[in-house]
């Protein structure tokens, strides 16, 4: 009998459902919320309401594209955290009702682990390389910046992490200061491709070990803009592509410096990147350069698997299903969860 997992993701502002059959992805439907753009960030109450409106049609579409009926499902995997509590509750509540009505198991998935395991998503007939355990994963998003030692799908160790702001958060805030809009990541990425990454210099943190810090960079960027704009009120408009390129290059250098140290310290040459910031062109290029220079075997996810999606939840749920690792229907959502 086939194992068919429905995955649900609702941790922030994307409602997503995916179906995996015997380890192969059949469908992955994502509904993003444009309502937040006018506010320059995600509004939790609006996100929760949008999830309530989207989750039923998204699940229906995922099952339809997969050619699967709900009665064929083996289990429901869902994001339990971390994330916005109101958003998480929509997915968790739907999963509970859905699983109970079908009398099938529930599988809780840590959103961060889902990002790491996105490298194991594959469609039938698709040729894609997957990392071998153990491997290193640079997990970078709006809320997290971590270097993770992945020993197994259910055995991960954080080697280093941000002590303040995440890389994605720093990018978004600097973008907002420049008046570029939200979300800042894709905007900075697009502008940076046209600019000179060495045009401006911003401070880099001196943090011991493998931990990160981005609050100092954010402050340096803000104060530099303030000083430059005293002489030229239109400084940002005149230099925005170079500002974006220099900011991106600084953040990528900070991320890769610690990752190099981790790879050398733990003697690992299989290195992956995951999370929303892994879509950044500068970071992806730096990974390729490191692969050539240091002999790394690198793993860069498809763009569709960098942002929040249910495919990563479904594949994690599939691995847990094989181990019969189910959760109680009473399990609550958790807004704060670590690896």
Tell where the protein language model's regions lie, with residue ranges:
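Conserved phosphate-binding catalytic cores of ATP/NTP-utilizing and phosphoryl-transfer enzymes
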Residues: 1-2, 109-135, 316
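N-terminal beta-alpha supersecondary unit
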Residues: 2-82
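Short beta-strand scaffold segments in enzyme catalytic cores
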Residues: 15-20, 137-139, 145-149
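Short Gly/Thr/Asp-enriched flexible loops that form oxyanion-binding sites at enzyme active sites
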Residues: 78-102, 121-122, 281-290
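Conserved phosphate-binding/catalytic loops in two-lobed NTP-binding clefts
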Residues: 108-109, 271, 288-313
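Glycine-rich phosphate-binding/hydrolytic loop that grips phosphoryl groups
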Residues: 115-117, 301-339
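Glycine-rich phosphate-binding loop plus the immediately following alpha-helix
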Residues: 151-194, 219, 223-229
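A contiguous, well-structured pocket-lining segment that forms one wall/lid of small-molecule binding clefts
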Residues: 190-271, 280-294, 321-324
């Amino acid at each position: 009998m086939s194992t068919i997992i429905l995955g649900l993701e609702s941790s922030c502002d994307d409602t997503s459902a995916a179906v995996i059959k015997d380890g192969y992805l059949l469908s992955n439907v994502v509904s993003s919320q444009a309502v937040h753009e006018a506010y320059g960030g995600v509004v939790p109450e609006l996100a929760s309401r949008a999830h309530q409106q989207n989750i039923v049609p998204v699940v229906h579409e995922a099952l339809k594209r997969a050619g699967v009926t709900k009665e064929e499902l083996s289990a429901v995997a869902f994001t339990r955290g971390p994330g916005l509590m109101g958003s998480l509750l929509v997915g968790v509540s739907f999963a509970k009702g859905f699983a109970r009505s079908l009398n099938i198991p529930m599988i809780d998935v840590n959103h961060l682990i889902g990002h790491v395991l996105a490298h194991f998503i594959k469609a039938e007939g698709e040729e894609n390389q997957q990392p071998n355990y153990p491997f290193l994963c640079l997990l970078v998003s709006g809320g997290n910046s971590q270097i993770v030692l992945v020993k197994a799908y259910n055995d991960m160790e954080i080697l280093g992490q941000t002590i303040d702001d995440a890389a994605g958060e720093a990018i978004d805030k600097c973008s907002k200061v420049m008046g570029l809009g939200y979300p800042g990541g894709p905007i900075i990425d697009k502008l940076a491709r046209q600019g000179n990454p060495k045009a401006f210099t911003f401070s880099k943190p001196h943090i011991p070990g493998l931990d990160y810090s981005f609050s100092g960079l954010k402050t340096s960027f803000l104060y530099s803009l303030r000083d430059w704009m005293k002489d030229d009120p239109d400084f940002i408009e005149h230099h925005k592509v170079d500002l974006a390129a220099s900011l991106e290059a600084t953040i990528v250098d900070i991320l890769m410096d610690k990752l190099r140290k981790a790879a050398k310290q733990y003697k690992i040459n299989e290195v992956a990147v995951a999370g929303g910031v892994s879509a950044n062109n500068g970071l992806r290029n730096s990974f390729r350069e490191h692969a050539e220079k240091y002999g790394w075997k690198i793993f860069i996810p498809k763009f569709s698997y960098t942002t929040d999606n249910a495919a990563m939840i479904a594949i994690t749920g599939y691995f847990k299903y094989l181990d019969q690792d189910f959760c109680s229907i009473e399990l609550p959502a958790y807004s704060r969860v670590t690896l």
